[in-house]
Design a protein with these regions (language model features):
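Solvent-exposed alpha-helices and their adjacent loops that cap or buttress functional pockets
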Residues: 9-11, 51-53, 70-73, 109, ...
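Structural signature of FAD isoalloxazine-binding scaffolds in flavoprotein oxidoreductases
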Residues: 50-69, 123-142, 167-174
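Conserved small/polar residues in nucleotide/adenosyl-binding loops
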Residues: 330-334
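C-terminal substrate-binding/cap subdomain adjacent to the FAD-binding core in PCMH-type
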Residues: 116, 134-320
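Generic non-transmembrane alpha-helical segments
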Residues: 32, 36, 312-325
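Flexible, glycine/proline-enriched loop segments at strand-loop-helix junctions
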Residues: 15-16, 75-80, 103-106, 123-125, ...
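Glycine-rich N-terminal segment of FAD-binding domains in flavoprotein oxidoreductases
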Residues: 8-105, 118-123, 209
Length: 334
């Protein structure tokens, strides 16, 4: 059966698709495949834009390995099966009054896919999801089941290893007490967004902005961490649905489709989208503020540069887009 990743950048037709339920089944699959000289490639949600999950032989689908394995309430550590999607984790943690310390704005990935590919959120004081890993269980390329503890020098390599050391079948995360976030979304000029970026990321818990190429329009988002008893406030549920689902996904999706079919329309679409930006503020649980609904498919790439160089790099990217006449609808910095 053909497989495609979420961004439609890669596809594959594996010879066999297997959905194991535990580490023992994974170990048996790897051992038998190794004996015949074959290869096994694990896949989660397929949300990586790279070809890391492309399987030519055996595709190991992690979707049957999901759920909570254990909680250490005193240490705030939780152990999850490797195929657990990020969007299922908040409900698993809620009875224990815990939350993940940081998240990106997409939660479709599996937990092991997220850590293995470096999924991250924002905030200079908070690392990516892989930095919260305190232990993991791995099935190696020889079919051995190995537990990696927090004192093991290989832990960092397993936590953010692109699957190079084996299949991560469960992972233990250091969590935090449940908390709320207060969000401020502010339309601003691209010059202001870029010029004020360093000050904002250094003074705020979490800051990011989205810039619409071919315009001077940007939308900044700043999140402030609050206790779990902070009052939930902001737009009504209907207003948020209109903003987040109807406008940001359905209407924007139609505009993106039009731009992909007629690239010459992209600058005009960007101008319309940029002028439609509006500010809002709201307070809610950390997950509901961190995560955004993303049904419009997109393709992205990321570079790591020195923090102080970010403004000049962004200005050069902006100049290059104009100079080379690339047709892009929006970019973000997080």
């Amino acid at each position: 059966m053909p497989w495609r990743n979420w961004g439609r950048t890669h596809s594959a037709t594996p010879r066999q698709v297997v959905r194991p339920h535990d580490a023992g089944e994974v170990a048996e699959l790897i051992a038998t495949t190794r004996q015949r000289g074959g290869t096994v490639k694990p896949v989660g949600a397929g949300h990586s834009f790279s070809g890391i999950a492309v399987a030519d032989d055996v595709q190991l689908d992690m979707s049957a390995m999901r759920g909570l394995l254990g909680v250490d309430a005193e240490r705030r550590h939780v152990t999850l099966k490797g195929g657990t999607p990020l969007f299922e984790i908040p409900e698993l943690l809620a009875p224990h009054h815990l939350a993940m310390a940081n998240l990106g704005d997409v939660d479709r990935q599996t937990i092991t896919g997220a850590i293995s590919t470096g999924t991250h959120g924002t905030g200079l004081a908070f690392g990516g999801i892989s930095t919260t890993v305190t232990a993991a269980t791995v099935v190696t390329g020889t079919g051995d089941v190995v537990h990696i503890g927090d004192d093991d020098p290989d832990l960092a390599a397993v936590a953010l290893g692109l699957g190079a050391l084996g299949v991560v079948v469960d992972v233990t995360l250091a969590c935090v007490d449940a908390f709320h976030l207060h969000a401020e979304e502010t339309p601003m000029s691209a010059d202001d967004a870029i010029g004020g970026f360093l000050d904002r990321v250094r003074s705020c818990d979490h800051h990011e902005f989205y810039w619409f190429p071919h315009t001077d329009c940007a939308l900044g988002k700043t999140n402030t961490r609050l206790g779990s008893l902070a009052e939930v406030s902001g737009p009504s549920r209907l207003r948020r649905w209109i903003d987040d689902e109807l406008l940001s996904n359905k209407v924007f999706g139609v505009l993106c489709e039009a731009g992909s079919r007629v690239p010459s329309l992209v600058p005009s679409i960007a101008q319309v989208s940029g002028r439609a930006l509006s500010g809002r503020s709201y307070t809610d649980s950390s997950t509901r503020v961190f995560v955004s609904s993303r049904t419009v498919r997109f393709r992205e790439m990321e570079y790591a540069v020195d923090l102080d160089a970010v403004p000049s790099v962004l200005r050069e990217i902006r100049s290059m887009i104009d100079r080379r006449r690339y047709c892009l609808l929006y970019t973000s910095d997080a």
